């Protein structure tokens, strides 16, 4: 998940992992985008640099911790470190490798040019597998320690968002999944490789063997958690939402950029704000504005998808925020999409289990697993009157970030 784990020649961890949401690499990200150039990056990897990607972290390490950089024998992503300890296999999967900015996404191989730019050797990078492929078996001593048989297989696994997409059945051509987790994503599965003109969306390999486009918000449910727990000092999320009934009429706006933003702005300096309060504004209006602001932020990425003439009419939804019936209704009307709720609430974990089932031969492929294991239990239809109200509000929302960008 784009975090950086580095081991020395003795397989000892050199330093604490630098996580996906670490913002220290602004300088390195700017160097990649401005000096190396976005066009060149896109040609090599199908993406431009974002502060959370792994390559900027490697450059930061080289500049700021040269002694640690010199010790690197293996470069890993967090989940792959666990697989390495369990099986001894130094590997990763294509979906997770896509976020390193070291992978040629279209051709599913490490980019020699990006390795040169980051001063990385191919032997320092893990072997590449499809997410559903078996990479090895559990070590005998660990099988004994955990009480497992030695026949336990280790499957490559996937990036959290790709796993969530599999776990909601978002595979094949034209599937859509919205994840309302700590971060928020809108994920479009595809059989064909695609890149948007401005690289506003991530263009990654998918865990089903195909490709996907993804818009990523750094703060989604975490915005709601911050508002509820830090500002309102409550953990009763449902109670705070139960009196919100006048959808589409609230004129308070919230920019959901607590930790900067990725898609589509790629601005680590962006910050959150409320706009439009008056003496009549209360906590219900502010709470509603937070939920709507996150939905509008995801809509920004959906607009990029629509600009590519990809027809999206419905979406799956997962993540902790998807437990809120109100939020799902807001999403349906802001996006003008049918929102399908699946039986399992554990998108990424369920998707990981599905990939393991394919790897162990229970299903022929990921599509077949999805057809058998995914069940839609509810659908929220958009209300065209609310769609019209939210369309008007969204057009105002999208003017705010450009207007205040210079203040950050």
Q: What is the predicted function of each stretch?
A:
Residues 1-20, 48-52, 83-104, 127-130, ...:
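Short beta-strand-loop/turn "lid" adjacent to the catalytic site in phosphate-handling enzymes
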Residues 118-130:
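A conserved helix-loop-beta module that forms one wall/lid of the active-site cleft
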